[in-house]
A protein has these predicted regions:
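Generic marker of residues within folded, mature protein domains
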Residues: 3-5, 37-39, 60-62, 76-78, ...
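Short amphipathic beta-strand and strand-loop transition segments with alternating hydrophobic
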Residues: 31-37, 89-96, 179
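Juxtamembrane "anchor/assembly" segments of surface/extracellular structural proteins
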Residues: 1-67, 103-112
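Short beta-strand-centered interaction patches in the first periplasmic/extracellular domains
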Residues: 2-3, 102-105, 109-111, 145-195
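Surface-exposed cap/loop segments at beta↔alpha junctions
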Residues: 55-146, 154-155
Length: 195
């Protein structure tokens, strides 16, 4: 078996930190990788290490603020396909009854930035797609918004997080919101468009 873990038949999940694969000595200590990705919700990733000394996350560069990526690798495709890209937000320690110590790294995709704080503001003479592009630009998130023909005199964000605001707009016109990795560029991209 490869030094990288989570092998299911021919599928292997590999962890990268700032685009560099973590060393085999650390990847063999990975006990669990869980990626949650849903439409209209930010994606998250948890990486759990068996870690008796509680040092692995720092030693392999998974410090708070660094970027973690999980790629699904199969057969001949050594680069694999990115299934998660996000920023490390928390490091946790867990203890098992058997005496084992675990380090848990939690990362969130770029859309989690849109959940920080509620705001009230207006967007004059814009379509919902243009509003999504403006919000993405304000938060330095590459945005792909499918144009919508209706231009509104004023679109109001009323004491909502940016994320809740975009989800509300999307639902009104039958669109969805998510952040996914663009396979052509490898960058996280905010999608605002039909299902």
């Amino acid at each position: 078996m490869s030094p990288y873990i989570m092998s299911t038949s021919d599928l292997i999940l590999r962890v990268f930190v700032d685009s560099i694969p973590i060393l085999p000595e650390f990847s063999t200590q990975i006990r669990r990788i869980e990626v949650e990705s849903q439409v209209n919700l930010p994606s998250s990733c948890e990486i759990e290490f068996t870690d008796p000394d509680l040092t692995i996350p720092m030693e392999c560069g998974l410090d708070i603020g660094n970027f973690a990526e999980v790629r699904a690798v199969t057969g001949d495709d050594a680069a694999g396909e990115a299934i998660f890209f996000g920023q490390v937000e928390t490091l946790e320690i867990q203890f098992e009854n058997s005496g084992g110590k675990l380090s848990v790294v939690r990362a969130y995709d770029a859309s989690h930035r849109l959940l920080h704080g509620q705001k009230t503001m207006g967007y004059p003479m814009m379509s919902y797609s243009e509003v999504a592009e403006a919000v993405g630009a304000e938060h330095a998130i590459v945005t792909e918004a499918v144009p919508h023909p209706v231009v509104h005199e004023m679109v109001v964000q009323a004491n909502e997080t940016y994320w809740d605001f975009l989800v509300r707009l999307a639902k009104e016109i039958g669109y969805v919101v998510n952040v996914a990795i663009n396979p052509l560029t490898g960058t996280p991209t905010l999608h605002f468009g039909p299902t």
